[in-house]
């Protein structure tokens, strides 16, 4: 099984970048890597009633992905880091998505 360290190394991203709190603009990009957003939401620590509320309130999958990440960031505040997001992708079995998301995080942090 891949670790966050493995993913960061494969993506060419320093681990200290992943320890940062997720910014809103990068969260919008990371939503693209949440193909199975309900599974990822569970791994991010959202409760079933929170997931159901997002699912019921919004129509499109894209809106649901963004809302789920917004809910996670709101709930976890400074603990909503890129590292935690990559861990959730890995726990959901989304290794390639984790690598691609890590690359996007690295690209955003270099600006």
Task: Briefly describe each language-model feature range.
Residues 1-5:
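Eukaryotic interaction-scaffold segments
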Residues 6-29, 36-111:
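Alpha-helical death-domain superfamily interaction modules
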